[in-house]
Amino acid sequence: MGFLKVLATSLATLAVVDAGTLLTASNTDAVIPSSYIVVMNDDVSTAEFNTHREWATNVHARLSRRKNGETGPGKHFEINGLKGYTASFDESTAKDIANDPAVKYIEPDMIVNATANVVQSNVPSWGLARISSKRTGTTSYTYDSTAGEGVVFYGVDTGIDISHSDFGGRAKWGTNVVDNDNTDGNGHGTHTASTAAGSKYGVAKKATLVAVKVLGADGSGTNSGVISGMDWAVKDAKSRGANGKYVMNMSLGGEFSKAVNDAAANVVKSGIFLSVAAGNEAENASNSSPASAAEVCTIAASTSTDGSASFTNFGSVVDLYAPGQSITAAYPGGGSKTLSGTSMAAPHVAGVAAYLMALEGVSAGNACARIVQLATSSISRAPSGTTSKLLYNGINV
């Protein structure tokens, strides 16, 4: 893999060699100006990757195109072999960097948001009871006492209020790529973590929880920040040992992003189950990321009467439904809150994945298929081309 190591060599010579592509965004409103994610070819070695980043830094400095304070290459990541980095370039420099044959593609960095969309008060939660029964209307949650013990849950979100009583001392901070405030200033991350693994509100009541903060107090972040969070979690899981059991929940989404999808795919390949919210735009989930990644478990939201929630995204990329309307779970400050959205549906599935890993020893790579196998065909009037499968923990199977 050749790199341009002598700056005096014309950049034009690279154009005749197979090189990367500068991708464009379908929704320019989501694009962060002058911000990019650079992804390298699969066969680029670590040494070549380092050399490329040094070269890119020099190209950025030499071309002096920094009209808006662009700073050049930034943080780099390596997720189970997927190498890349964030960068602040003007468009002309980005095109020049894309001409390096070591580059697979460059895409604009974009805004990503938490996917909860409705807040309701004084509504009892019903999701736990529904996932342990084959019919509606039950009021008890039945589960095996293993309850996700020995499994690590990564909440890639707005953070977790680790002092909340619903976590019973099982939650800790992992990383924060947003700011220096290791708190959940939004509440979304605490709620989703509680749904997955809270002692009172959660599915896998004995799992360990790790906060991976990639969204700020306003519920928004960047694709590059999300990728950094995934990168950290993969490395943390690796440090814990190859025989560990790991699940990740990402109740967030944005415009379609090849970089985010590729990163999510490599999270799964590394041995971490990944549950993802389908999104709340009432449109085909293939338009958003990471929901459209083939390797993840993409979750739509159901109602208490087994309907498809009016807001949920849909389509062939959806693996199954889970309770997502009027879900009560822990909230920062010691209390609880009732929220609706595919954000609430996805952690139910992450919790069941942790539950099955502890109970059956199912692997991360097979967990989504096992969950779909156990699911009941209960959703009435699912949108055309969308599964009718509804999450079920298999307690009476």
From Swiss-Prot:
Site (Not glycosylated): 113, 249, 284
Keyword Calcium attached: no
Summary of pH dependence: Active at pH 7 (up to 40 degrees Celsius for 30 minutes) and at pH 11 (up to 25 degrees Celsius).
Domain of life from the UniProt record: Eukaryota
PROSITE patterns reported for this sequence: SUBTILASE (PS51892), SUBTILASE_SER (PS00138)
Pfam family, one: Inhibitor_I9
Annotated site (Important for catalytic activity): 280
Annotated catalytic residues: 157, 188, 343
One GO MF term: serine-type endopeptidase activity
Signal peptide coordinates: 1-19
GO cellular component: extracellular space
Propeptide intervals in chain numbering: 20-115
Temperature dependence: Protease activity is retained up to 40 degrees Celsius for 30 minutes, but completely inactivated at 50 degrees Celsius (at pH 7). Activity is retained up to 25 degrees Celsius, and completely inactivated at 40 degrees Celsius (at pH 11).
Residue ranges occupied by any Inhibitor I9 domain in the UniProt entry: 35-113
CDD domains in alphabetical order: Peptidases_S8_PCSK9_ProteinaseK_like (cd04077)
EC supergroup of this enzyme: hydrolase
Family according to the record: Belongs to the peptidase S8 family.
Protein name from the UniProt record: Subtilisin-like serine protease Pen c 1
Biological source species: Penicillium citrinum
